[in-house]
Amino acid sequence: DLFMFFFFWEMMLVPMYFLIALWGHSSSDGKKTRIYAATKFFIFTQASGLIMLVAILGLVLVHFNQTGVITFAYADLLKTKLAPGTEYILMLGFFIAFAVKLPVVPLHSWLPDAHAQAPTAGSVDLAGILLKTAAYGLLRFALPLFPNASAEFAPIAMTLGLVGIFYGAFLAFAQTDIKRLIAFSSVSHMGFVLIGIYSGSQQALQGVLIQMIAHGLSAAALFILSGQLYERLHTRDMREMGGLWSRIAYIPAISLFFAAASLGLPGTGNFVGEFLILLGSFASSPWITAIATSGLVFGSVYSLIMIHRAYFGPSKSDEVLKGMDGREMIMVLGLAVLLVVLGVFPQPFLDTSAATMHGVQQWLGTAFTQLASAR
């Protein structure tokens, strides 16, 4: 039911807003407050949600004109016949809402502020759950409801994904706040997801699923580790860190593992997801795939820059800091185990998603074929 989907889509904003506004922090430079970040997050997502509501009502109205029945039922709306121009406009309404939440450049600017000011739990929630609902929305609603418009829009969407990969990587280089660096790395990783979704390949679509799960695990772990650093150092500014490898037990080594996983370390879920996305996308878009592959190099650079700035180099102090306690260790090691299991045994996840992703691929693949024959 599209109305229920929209209702709960908007309900997600409320707890996240209060998580940032009430329990968040100021930015490391002190210029941006948690209220600023929470308000920016709310405005971006609320405005895009209203655009999607207009698109939903437009689709319902077209269906009513054809059948005389007002319904928000997904199965009924799938049967609605749409004129090409109408389909494209309605698809854009859905795409904009999901692009803000994913996020897609240039609709991403709320994410670094939200991550930087959110408490650790809020950042984990954002990276692990909220961003993934946007990809789910594209796969479940935008592509099946508007396959022809999605096929026509695919080159633009894949180009936006490509821009996101490099834009997120370049801005990650420039960050001094460790949470903002991880946030921009998320923008870069979601570029691969967008390319996979619009590739029209079942292999790439299954890679999208693996990549979303793996990114949720690795990004959540990196935010947890940055929160643990903040508890000990009372700063997220990497210029105030340095030399921590010899001053804190366990945290540097575990951070190195998750940073390597984030850049696609073989044996982790991130490698499987990115590999399937690039392999599946190559047949339909070889140039975009080739350029996106080079973006992985930049991913490795900003990940290693983060590790070098925080844990190596000259030490700011000789004080030995408290190591990880049992609770902190269990949290991150649990995520590490899940990430390795996903990387070594992805087949159960691929088998589970095969039928669903085949259906999505059929909708988009048929539309691609019709578009090619029309040209």
Positions of PLM-derived features:
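Acidic, glycine-rich loop-and-beta core segments that form the ion-binding/anion-interacting portion
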Residues: 112-114, 118, 130, 134-216
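Juxtamembrane/interfacial segments at transmembrane-helix boundaries in multi-pass membrane proteins
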Residues: 25-28, 33-40, 50-108, 142-156, ...
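Alpha-helical multi-pass transmembrane bundles of energy-transducing inner-membrane proteins
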Residues: 2-82, 86, 171-184, 188-237
